[in-house]
Amino acid sequence: MPTKLWPLAAALLLAPLALGQDERPNFLLIIADDVTYNDLPLYGGPNISTPNIDGLASEGLTFNRAYLSMAMCNPCRTELYTGLYPFRNGSSWNHSAARTGTLSVVDHLGRLGYRVGLAGKKHVLPDESFRFESVAGITNHREPTPVPEFDTSDIEEFMGREGDEPFFLVTAFHEAHAPWTVGSPDKFDLAKLALPDNLADTPRTRGQFATYLAEIEVWDWEVGRVLDALDASGQADRTVVLLTSEQGSAFPGNKWTNWNTGVRTALVVRWPGRIAAGARTDALVQYADVLPTLVSAAGAEAGDQFDGHSFLPVLRGQTADHREYVYLMHNNVPEGPPYPIRSIVDARWHYIRNLQPEALYFEKHMMGAFRTNWFWETWLAASGPSAQAAINRRAVMLANRFMRRPAEQLYDVAADPYQMRNLIGDLGLADVRDRLATALGRWMQSQGDPGASLDSEAMWRNAREGRHLPPRSGP
């Protein structure tokens, strides 16, 4: 996909930020649930249509290389709302809790005079750290329905409320989290679907992939409804809109992993009059950078209270780069037995360290009694008609790739987005491996991350009860 990067000269076209009380922008964050970034047409996805997302991107800046530290809902949202990496904020597992006293976007923007609200999925704890004003309208649908109920009147009221206070509003949708129950999957010709390279081509996989794609199209419709509500509120011209797809989908190799299609996310930012329309950037950013960016855009100094750093200069077109590395981790408890992972990404390479490679990876929602998807067993079937032999062999290969992993993995991000070719044994890349491994170890040490011992039932339960391991004292 061609990349149109910001020219540095664009900075000359953008006025410097010097905000008075009535010039502070509003912020509207639109977030999906378990949408793999490159299933979206904006990132090359070939199967669906998303006119509202594409329209938003045509009016703003698309980040080609945005990431989140953990490919699970609770940890990535805690990172997003705190500007801190998982070990320092405390949410180092799914269904866990931030450290007692952790400050969030509610505190940081609230102190700057913002009303801070959330409509839809919250999934962050403790409540004392995330005291969003609750805004009605977005509900979770567990029964099949082509079009979900979605009343935007309270969302519009929150954005258009009279007064001098600017707003920050999260609209957090449940699409496309499994089980995939909304939308119209029957519209897809299963035989013509282009399956991603990391999915086994079985009939059940194709059928469930269609139900997942249908939910993404519903999310796009919901995005359009939210943007219509913003227009109706009269606040569109002074509102920064951020759209992100969260972690990857609940298919093997995406969510619950440190592979590219798990930890990489869509990110689009629209800021009328401040961002050139239809631009793209290869700047490396991650969720920990978002809150410092909002604080800076609101006219305050982000300082050193965050792990992340403001990418406001990227938005302004003043630089094409942001950070040298993004930092990633995974603790498998409570989604399965321990399988700790740490990894690091730079402009080209992705290095993964599996801390217990002797273990068998298992995730209960895809592979066990809690599963809501029914394709996994078809990946394990090695027998069948001769015409299916090659498909079956590939399915078993992909299942083994998912369950059994080496101690180290190294991938060329641009050449291998589905990360099917592990280059760790390439002697010509030994210097790359050593550089990334050293940087990863330095990051873990700076956070106070003990590594494999963190991925345990006891550690997870202690964290949920507010008894975390102590972090290091500063970023």
Regions found by a protein language model. Give the residues of each.
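Bacterial N-terminal signal peptides that target proteins for export
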Residues: 1-8
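Post-cleavage N-terminal segment of exported redox proteins
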Residues: 7, 18-19
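Hydrophobic helical h-region of N-terminal Sec-dependent signal peptides
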Residues: 8-14
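Formylglycine-dependent sulfatase
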Residues: 12, 19-409, 417-442, 451-452, ...
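C-terminal helical cap and adjacent loop that interface with cofactors, partners, or active-site loops
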Residues: 414
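A glycine-rich phosphate-binding loop feature that marks nucleotide/adenosyl-phosphate handling sites
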Residues: 456-460
